[in-house]
Amino acid sequence: MLAKAAASASSSMEKGSVYLDFTDIKCIQYTSSIRKLEQLVHVCKVLLRNLSMKSNENLIPLSNIVIALGSGFQFNVSAAIEKRIELLSQFRSCKANATNLPLSTTSLKLEVDLVPVEEDSVLFVSKFYNKELQSQLLTTLQRVAEDSLQIYQARIRQLTMERNSNRPTDLSGRTTIFNEDALNDLLSPNELAFGLDLLVNIRNRSTDTSSSAFFALALPILEKFRSNLNDKCIPPIRSYYTSIMKFSRTKGVFSNNVLIQLPYWQFTLHRMYAASLRAKCLIDVIRAVLRQIYIPNKHHFHDNTTKLHSKNLHEYSELLEELETFCFTQELEKDLIEAFKSYGNQNTVYQVQFNNISSAYQRLLLKSTQMLRKAAKLVDSFSTQWKSISDNMKASKYDDMNIDEMAKMAEEKLAVDELAYNEKIKEQERQREEKKNSSLSQKNTSSSSSITSNSSSLNVSPNILSPLRLSRTSSVSRSEESRSPSSPIPFTDAKSNISAKKTRSVRTRNRSSSLQSVSSLEDTSTARNGMRSNSLQSGSLNTQRIVQNAYSKALLSLNEKRGPRLTPTKLNNSIRSKSPSPTVSRQNSVKQRNKVNILKLNEVDEDDINEKFHDLKLDDDTLIVSQEVLSPEGSETPKIIVSVADDNQSSSNNDSEVEGIVKKVRFIGVPPMSQDENPEPKRRGWYKKPAVLHYPPPPAQHSLQKFRTTQEGLAFRTSLISRDQGSDKKFGFDSMYSSGQGADTKIVGKIKDKLFK
């Protein structure tokens, strides 16, 4: 029991799946053969019935093409049946009696021998248009197929009994049955549907039975076979191949999700073997059909007249070489046959696991699909070239030329077409390389931009502008880290100041339950010391990112407007403490100072600029959650004024700086509850709630990650706001929002939203 439990625990087989063994492989081979033979018998019956019903017409069944469509490993069930099919393919009669074979359940031989085809076109055409011979061959083919079908039906019954008796049972005590419906879409012999059209009506015996007539008839046969192949035979295999390819490229938990979405995923290995076997069968059918068309017409295809009518003789010559290789050799299929044999080991079991599926994909499905794709491409090229030659032959431009002249013209055409073909290949490679480079450049651009955005949003020290650090540092001195030039500074233009005579309406918001309303800044600061509220550390990080984005955009806008040869102007920071009701004289002095700063020219060094950057400070008032409702008359939101110089104006020495007052804001946590807030219970049996229950539990790891992602997205959305929203607003917080919503109100809203969440 312990050994079984350990084995089941170590196995990664998907629950509910069915493993593949040697018995199931034989079941797949037998099932595929039965489906093919049943369809072949049906086609023979339909053709013979049409011949009997239309006996007054001169209809000839193309039995040799029907035999080629029905060729495959299914006739390897017996050496006698294999020999009969070979004789029928050569227009020779054979016995049609039933074969008595001992009942056995051995595996099938998947190699298909090449049947000799008559190369003499005159002899082949005489047999091809012989109605009695073709009808006799069709009748014999039906009987041989029925005999083979009976043998397979007896074998599949015996094999099913052996499988049910030898296969281990599941937890319920039942044996998993071999579901043939799971293989229907992959094993359906759709190529035999083309055989129903293989009846030729001969109207004029003298003209319709010549070698030229057979050459003209072979083209529509090839085109219909090509259409049937591309529309009915290949799509099921291509679709399943694509799904398995997607699965093989996934790993881990995702591979299981892709696996269970496949049709009949429990029989995945069975379906992969069936699809590979079906591809092998289609390759044999394509070779048999091409041999029946190409070999009798070989002298026509290699004739100089045909070559001169080709669109590109170099491509046509390569096509003929490929046809020779494909029709007369089977070298490319040796590796595939060996792969099929490796899965035929009697004591091997393949579980539905990622490794086994990937191995079957590489060794069976991928190889067979690639070979099938090459064979189908060869049929397409052959049909296209032949169609072009047939259209060009209607002009008859070379009828009056002798053999030597045509041979010389063919050599010249080959040289010219080879150069054109090479130029075409180079152009295609160049376009492919350009497309590849453009895609790589786009990918690198997108990746670099994403890296830049990630670094700008992630590589920020929380100690630079956190309220906790501002509260613990002195109002006069700052550390080098907080005074670095990379520290974010909010910018506002001097022209954006509003005089005291103008009015501004500020939108009010709902009050937080953890914040108290006070009439002045000092009352607010002192009243919060004993209040309960959530930590604003995350909100300060959000504020920090918003300020940094505003500073980056303002600096970029400033550099763009200055031009490449101009040096930065002197920046003067004037940090003012918030005043609930500023006086008119104070505003006038600020306006006068701003006008002087705007008139400055580019007279200051970059070192001077850096020193001024070090002296810039963040106004702590922007971090204070204010609940003041400003009256519509004469009220104004506090601002941080940083003046910049314009390139087209003169300098002035009337610059004056105002000492800034930095106020400490308390964001150091939540004090313990007072006795008034949490009194001792006076009733019997009551007890005081533990202090830990008054505070929220620490968030989980995924919550922290989600919160961090939300913060990054918030900073990214803020960075997408356009810089210049008006001629009078060059940069700063106020240029990012509407006139009714200032920078302070926006930051307060962000902090409150995080508190409520």
From Swiss-Prot:
It is found in: Cytoplasm. GLC7 phosphatase-regulatory protein involved in GLC7 subcellular redistribution and chromosome segregation. Belongs to the GIP4 family. This is GLC7-interacting protein 4. Interacts with GLC7. Residues 427-541, 558-590 are annotated as: Disordered. Keywords: Cytoplasm.
